[in-house]
A protein has these predicted regions:
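ABC-family P-loop ATPase nucleotide-binding domain
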Residues: 1-51
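P-loop NTP-binding/switch modules centered on Walker-like glycine-rich loops
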Residues: 73, 210, 214, 218-262
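ABC ATPase NBD Q-loop/coupling interface
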Residues: 95-118, 155
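Conserved ABC ATPase signature
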Residues: 180-184, 188
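Hydrophobic anchor residue at the start of the ABC signature
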Residues: 194, 206, 222
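A short, proline-enriched helix->beta-strand linker immediately N-terminal to the Walker B motif
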Residues: 199-203, 219
Length: 262
């Protein structure tokens, strides 16, 4: 099979259907009535005159080692949902229950920023735009290694060895780790972002339209890479996209979002 062709996974189920062979006690993520409302301000004193209901009562679950596709048109609240789950935005209301590696269930909405920090090792995000999500003043080594330094996982020679391994895992030559993002193509930049996401061995990944900014031929390569890594590492993934033809190749179930609701 050509590397520019996506691997077929067969038919997918919609979000309300139960995956075969799964038990109800293996949820890794359960979202209940999640709301994310942004204030609308007007006038000299910038008083709140209303709210934009970007996410308005969204509920779904995600099982261990499952890929759930969250699809919908632009502006429907998909990305905001993903960012709210990871607490990049503080949700207005609702519950986001996450089962940690030790089996403990915790409502992410109710914990503090300090309590959230260790969870960021288990919950990671792949950003949509490989051009703006990478710091142009940092080398690839620094970009991929930054999470390892922040969480005090590795430094020095061990850090370089880990970065080299991560680059190899995503199909990049480790000899290029001293280069800067502008020296890579769009597909290669997305692979750099993927390596950064995988650096802390996460259990849950929110992939925010990871191929929408890429050429069609490159999309297939990145999708196949995501599928291979998911199968090899046993990852759980919320895959956000606006194109059903993309999600059908990697997702087990699909949730369709429209004007802030599923």
């Amino acid at each position: 099979m050509s590397q520019n062709q996506t691997q077929s996974r067969g038919p997918v189920d919609f979000a309300w259907q139960q995956p075969n062979g799964k038990q109800s006690d293996d949820y890794i993520l359960e979202v209940k009535n999640l709301k994310q409302h942004f204030p609308i301000r007007s006038g000299f004193f910038q008083r709140v005159v209303g709210h934009t209901k970007a996410v308005d009562g969204v509920s779904f679950f995600l099982r261990e080692q499952e890929v759930l596709g969250l699809v919908g048109e632009s502006g429907c609240g998909k990305t905001t949902t993903g960012r709210s789950i990871l607490r990049l935005y503080d949700p207005t209301d609702g519950e986001v229950w996450y089962r940690k590696a030790n089996g403990e269930r915790i409502d992410i909405v109710k914990i503090t920023s300090n309590e959230m920090k260790p969870l960021r090792r288990e919950m990671r995000m792949i950003f949509q735009d490989p051009f703006s999500s990478l710091n142009p003043r940092m080398t690839v080594r620094d970009i991929i290694g930054e999470p390892l330094i922040i969480h005090k996982v590795a430094k020095g020679r061990e850090l370089e060895d880990r970065v080299a391994k991560l680059m190899s895992d995503v199909g990049l030559n480790p000899a290029y780790m001293r280069r800067y993002p502008h020296e890579f193509s769009g597909g290669q930049r997305q692979r750099i972002g993927l390596a950064r996401t995988l650096s802390l061995n996460p259990r849950l990944i929110v992939a925010d339209e990871p191929v929408s900014a890429l050429d069609v031929s490159i999309q297939a390569q990145v999708l196949n890479l995501l599928q291979e890594i998911k199968d090899e590492l046993g990852l759980t993934m919320l895959f956000i996209a606006h194109d059903l033809s993309v999600v059908e190749h990697i997702c087990d179930r699909i949730a369709v979002m429209y004007v802030g609701k599923i």
